[in-house]
Amino acid sequence: MTHSAILGSKTYNQYFPKLTPGQLAENGKIKVIVGMSGGVDSSVSAFILQQQGYQVEGLFMKNWEEDDDTDYCTAAADLADAQAVCDKLGIRLHKINFATEYWDNVFEHFLSEYKAGRTPNPDILCNKEIKFKAFLEYAAEDLGADYIATGHYVRRSGPDHDAHLLRGLDNNKDQSYFLHALSKKQVGQSLFPVGEVEKTVVRAVAEELGLITAKKKDSTGICFIGERKFKDFLARFLPAQPGDIKTTEGEVIGRHQGLMYHTLGQRKGLGIGGIKGKDENAWYVVEKDLKNNVLVVAQGHDNSALQSSGLIAKQLTWVSEQPLRKTLHCTVKTRYRQTDIACEVVPVNDDTVEVHFDEPQIAVTPGQSAVFYQGEECLGGGIIETQIK
């Protein structure tokens, strides 16, 4: 009898279907390794799977070697929390260090993108290369897992061999944007227990179980940077090259510390304002001119220089693993938490698409991901190469 047989949650019983003895017995033959991050979502995911009868074990992975960064890196505290949750649930916690793989497959790419003037999203690459690749392989080969599970707010449908990725039920927390680069094979080997409910339900279950992570705040920002200033972190790895800030007319109105510190559509932190002969409208970054090391800015949120009618995306990944062969009418997100944009996606070749928005959009940022949806289903996406004006 596991500890969780003694632990109970009224909220769990209310939101999750009760399985028959037959279903529980079937699930009892299946081993699931849960990625325990030390957060509330993975904690409750482990409990849900236990309640559903699976053989559950946890795996905590470390992806970053802190040197003197203990103030910023929460790895030790997260491991302690993950261990406390596993002890309470009565499950085993394995540990693995993927710092080398992370550096080689995620961090080096992150730096090279910044060097090239783009704004990358390392979380997407981490999911593709580490959580659903290195982690998945280790869980299957070394720990004998039939599936892995994570605390992501997404859902899956279809059989394992033809799995589809869907948005999480909680629209506010949906994380399909970050998982769009997974293949149907990776989705088919994964379970997402909290994707079927809202975040408030997850917190309530954790409270009722008395889990140490119940009130822990969600992690935000890039995992290897933690709470520290992004600028300071980047400066340790990439030398900054200060240069001019110019208006779209070519007038120099200030200096920047380095193009890599700025992103398209940015308004704050430009250090310009109250310029003689200019109105009070806020300044926005509209271009990063790498060749001349110039940051180009324009005034006003609705300035046409900020807008684009579409984008070109490359490095495409489709969950179905089938390249796009004909024009697709769907919706796209060009950043996380954005409202879906109706669009037309035109294949140029297997690795490039042109995306035409129904309405012009602002701050479409090279290096970020364009992610495509058909209703609830996340189809895949690519890296934004350039805007179409």
Swiss-Prot record:
A Pfam family annotated for this UniProt entry: tRNA_Me_trans
Active site: C126, C223
A single GO BP: tRNA wobble position uridine thiolation
Molecular function (Gene Ontology), one example: ATP binding
Location of the protein in the cell: Cytoplasm
Disulfide bonding pattern of the chain: C126-C223
Annotated InterPro entries: MnmA-like (IPR004506), MnmA-like_C (IPR046885), MnmA-like_central (IPR046884), MnmA-like_central_sf (IPR023382), Rossmann-like_a/b/a_fold (IPR014729)
Keyword Iron in annotation: no
Start and end residues of each stretch annotated as Interaction with tRNA: 173-175, 335-336
Catalytic activity: S-sulfanyl-L-cysteinyl-[protein] + uridine(34) in tRNA + AH2 + ATP = 2-thiouridine(34) in tRNA + L-cysteinyl-[protein] + A + AMP + diphosphate + H(+)
Top-level taxon of the source organism: Bacteria
Residue segments, region Interaction with target base in tRNA: 121-123
Chain residues that bind ATP: G35, M36, S37, G38, G39, V40, D41, S42, M61, G151
PANTHER family linked: MITOCHONDRIAL TRNA-SPECIFIC 2-THIOURIDYLASE 1, TRNA 5-METHYLAMINOMETHYL-2-THIOURIDYLATE -METHYLTRANSFERASE
UniProt cross-references to NCBIfam families, sorted A to Z: PRK00143.1 (NF001138), trmU (TIGR00420)
Family from the record: Belongs to the MnmA/TRMU family.
Protein role: Catalyzes the 2-thiolation of uridine at the wobble position (U34) of tRNA, leading to the formation of s(2)U34.
Protein name: tRNA-specific 2-thiouridylase MnmA
Highest classification ranks of the organism: Bacteria, Pseudomonadati, Pseudomonadota, Gammaproteobacteria, Pasteurellales
